[in-house]
């Protein structure tokens, strides 16, 4: 079902980069409402078939990750973050589905900026519609040192949309919009 939705909502796999960038920028906008001096960055790295997109945005609590990432159509881009919906690039909370066009799973590590002691949480979703959410323990190597979110995709074997030159071109294209 998730795979079917992701393939029918988007014009093609290339939009996954746009959606990752858009989510990162929106998260930074939300964090800047709490902390105008917060760092503002979105980085994408590729190692083999693994793509990581890291932002310095507001991050998610365990409850937010379970509710927002696991419900098609859910979105944090609502007034509860203190921002009018029109302040965000993405509106519908379905952008993450585009990642399933290049990967069978999505792993999200996130640490909320709403509390100084927020733990890093991990959310893992799969194309068959299953997911898990849990906080990471203090010694876990995936703990984020600062608030924000890291999305990790393990691309399908031979997936052309993970090629570093292709990703760089897509970032350049979508960053100019």
Language-model segments: which ranges?
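Charged, low-complexity intrinsically disordered tails
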Residues: 163-168
